[in-house]
Amino acid sequence: MKNNTKSFTFSNLGLLAIALFWLAATAHAQIFPTARAKTRAESVPDGYSVIDGDIIMPTAKVKAILSGQKELPDVNDAVYIDLLWTNGIVLFEFDINVSAANQSAAISAMAVLESVANVQFEQCPFNSCPILANFVHIQNSTMNSSQVGMVGLRQNLNVANWETQYVIVHELLHALGFYHEQMRSDRDTYIQINCGNLQGGCNGDVYNANFKVPLLSVNYGYYDFDSLMHYDECAFSNDCAAGSTCACTNKVITVRPPNQNQQTLIGQRTHLSALDRATVSFLYPADDWRFYDCTYPAILGTGTFLHPYADPITALVATPPGGTLWVLKNCSFPVRVYNQQVTVKTAPGVTARFGN
């Protein structure tokens, strides 16, 4: 995705809407608006369990998260990057149970993400991916679900609500590496989980599998109530059928002050928020984008979003002519003559300055 080039043009764009959890896992999103069905063997691979309502991850990892323990061996940041799709290319195939109309619906959903990020969905020749390739197998199901990130070899993406485009987009975002917004470690600052209205309360299996925050989560940006990846206010309410969402009276999720105007808006499945778009574009950026964060450890900086440059001069010099340098924190550039023809943009709430 290319931008018009301006020399040191500053603008505020939405940074990140979503809590990103770089764990090899699977997510399955709420069926929308119908009730959630039980997990089927063909939808969830052996050795995987459901967590976060629509997240299916290796059972051993689920046990580690729910017990408050890290998995061994310890996972470091370098491994997290490997969960992104190489060069933004996502190979896929359709199961024979997916109709032509539903295939078209999925391809249209893919186009939504291709329009905002440097990602490309490529259907395998003859709709059959090599057995040793990394690819997404898209199938008709009684649930909406998707493995999270590029987990290696075949991974399933299940769709029940083909008629709702942004339910499919939601699942594709899981496949690109995203978890849910309300799984952020800072979520209790913004929303309250009403245990009395939740199926089984806050000590039950529903809470543990759907609302408990993993220790290994990584947050970027501010809390986005408008995110496509947020639960709705009635998720798993006692008013609803088991494992489902409905027009409940006793809300499970209450938005805290001063953001109560978002109460009925959370959980939308109609669009990508501005921050959703920014998030996916940063993780799958244009080839000429670089990132700068003066608070990041310099020795680790490579110019990517996850590992930005810490030195402003290094960042500017490394940005290709005509490219874009994103400033991720309140940072400054030293006073000097600059001849790099690049566009400099800032994340939301971030101020980039020249001089002290």
Protein language model regions, located:
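Right-handed parallel beta-helix/beta-solenoid
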Residues: 91, 286-314, 318, 343-355
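N-terminal extracellular ligand-recognition/capping segment immediately after the signal peptide
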Residues: 321-356
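Short strand-loop junctions, especially beta-strand C-caps/beta-turns
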Residues: 93-97, 295-297, 330
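Bacterial N-terminal signal peptides that target proteins for export
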Residues: 2-15
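Hydrophobic beta-strand residues in large extracellular and virion-surface proteins
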Residues: 121, 136-138, 157, 292, ...
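Bacterial N-terminal signal peptides
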Residues: 14-24
